[in-house]
Amino acid sequence: ERVVVNQMHRSPGVFFDHDKGKTHSSGKLLFNCRIIPGRGSWLDFEFDPKDILYFRIDRKKKLPVTTILLALGYDKKKIIETFHTISKYTFDKDTKMWITDFNPENFKRPIKISHDLVDAKNKKVVLNKGEKLNYVIAKKLKEKSLDKIILNSKDILGKYLSTDVKDNNGQVIIKAGFDINEEILEKIISNEIKVLDLVDIDPINKGPYLLETLKVDKCNSKTDALNEIYKVLRPGEAPTTQIAEDLFKNLYFDKDRYDLSEVGRVKLNSKLNLDFKNRKTILNTDDIIAILKFMLDLRDGRGEVDDIDHLGNRRVRSVGELVENQFRIG
């Protein structure tokens, strides 16, 4: 005879948590996220102590999170533009300065500016280095017709490139995602680069975590990313591009092999403020992008983690469901 008892387990959905400072000696909080389906492979996202963002499939070897975005068809430029605001910087030959648009939206959270704010029209300083700048002040400056500001070359040090920088022959001399240091700045000046697309990064309010992750990612294309994921899931086997792509699609985007469940979909939509009309029980690109944005917000001090032990995040597996699972295994 066999007795079957109802089981309580984690409810399907997406859950955000941190290690409570136990992993790193400094007590730094390392945030993580897990997507638990009703049936199928688990998908985890996690920060390491260096603020690099990784993902794992079924708790296997971790890979940089940009690898999964490349596998979804994004290129590096699109990855950066999805998560960050990009500003165009134009080099002015006469003044030897860089000119860019002044956008109050970049100052939603107050900062102390790291350089003088100079009006490009009249070359007057409107705010001195070290002064406080917030959205209200920025909006007033914009209303007073501050449209463009100028910066000297040293002021763009530390900013990240959103696109590859090419020389006059079309050769890539600096890859997208790298921050401008003295050496890179010298390359930009010596190659007479006139226009740069730079990421608006403010270390206090929005960190460069995804940009730093791009640096450690060895993959440069969708094919590279699919092959890298295949190697983790099927070590020792040499994949073709089609086999690698089929394996990746079957993981989370095939309703026969993956089922987030209706409860999981509702919880995911609710947590991430996604389209409530979406009732599909497979993952899509928008889900993964929204989850990564939430993870980045958590690291920047916005949003709250979930209580894994709360009974609202648990559900009862009935006897019928347990029997159904045994039949599926058979």
Predicted segments with their positions:
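N-terminal non-catalytic structural scaffold regions of very large proteins
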Residues: E1-G330
